[in-house]
Amino acid sequence: MLDANKLQQAVDQAYTQFHSLNGGQNADYIPFLANVPGQLAAVAIVTSDGNVYSAGDSDYRFALESISKVCTLALALEDVGPQAVQDKVGADPTGLPFNSVIALELHGGKPLSPLVNAGAIATTSLINAENTEQRWQRILHIQQQLAGEQVALSDEVNQSEQTTNFHNRAIAWLLYSAGYLYCDAMEACDVYTRQCSTLINTIELATLGATLAAGGVNPLTHKRVLQANNVPYILAEMMMEGLYGRSGDWAYRVGLPGKSGVGGGILAVVPGVMGIAAFSPPLDEEGNSVRGQKMVASVAKQLGYNVFKG
């Protein structure tokens, strides 16, 4: 049994130590994100048996952004299976920025990873759907099943994203021309942009992690969301590419599958045990929350979790 006092102390200590850490800046290329108050910070644990521990601004709702890629990858694995995802999208780190097109050029147009923009757009196109709205509703539903029913599209974030997503539109057409997009290019880009524009809070983000930790069963609703045998593929991708250019450093120092988003959220999974999530808007140069990384790493270290430990 996990010690409730120890878990609450871990999040309290992480928050106290790092919530006012200086450094980083909000993403400024998406107008909505530039205006989120930079002093916000939160950290939370949700255990695989459904206990919740949090500190800071844990009710504040922020844009899910790239963490949505985990949810869409999960749905694609349910729809087409791990082999098809590997064949049609890839399962390798790119070693390049999340919005890079260089990896596409180097690998014949194949995006390599579902957790960078090119691969995520391709993954969105893999979802079984007859039209744009069905594709979008299925992705929204999996986000809600994994994290909580309150996860919803923000029209303000979506508008802010849709009017600035020219680079992603270009990526979508490159994928389409290379044969690695499986629906209309602008449909894939539209739905991908929407999936990044949902709002979530830190406890819900930790719930997403706890659902993965529990082998696909949401510990708060007790409903099976994913097949248990698909979860290791998701965690492997998170370990390889979840923090973009910081992924190797994160694996080396923290040793947990993770995923960040430019909205300031960051998630880590302790398989079989818990999800750990944090939020704070200022980002490092790779697009990861500066305080969020420190808070999640602190919780993991205090509790002694690292998947590479014997």
From Swiss-Prot:
In terms of InterPro entries, this protein maps to: Beta-lactam/transpept-like, Glutaminase
UniProt-listed Gene3D superfamilies: DD-peptidase/beta-lactamase superfamily
Q: Does the keyword Hydrolase apply?
A: yes
In Gene Ontology terms, what is a biological process of this protein?
glutamate biosynthetic process
Q: Which SUPFAM superfamilies match?
A: beta-lactamase/transpeptidase-like (SSF56601)
Its keywords, alphabetically, are: Acetylation, Hydrolase
**Annotated residues for binding of substrate:** S66, N117, E161, N168, Y192, Y244, V262
User: Per the UniProt record, which EC number(s) apply here?
Assistant: 3.5.1.2
- Catalyzes what? L-glutamine + H2O = L-glutamate + NH4(+)
Alphabetically, the GO molecular function entries are: glutaminase activity
Any single Pfam family the record assigns to this protein: Glutaminase
N6-acetyllysine: residues bearing it: K294
Q: Does the keyword Translocase apply?
A: no
Query: Subunit structure of this entry?
Result: Homotetramer.
Entry similarity comment: Belongs to the glutaminase family.
Q: What is this protein called?
A: Glutaminase
Which source organism does the UniProt entry give?
Escherichia coli O81 (strain ED1a)
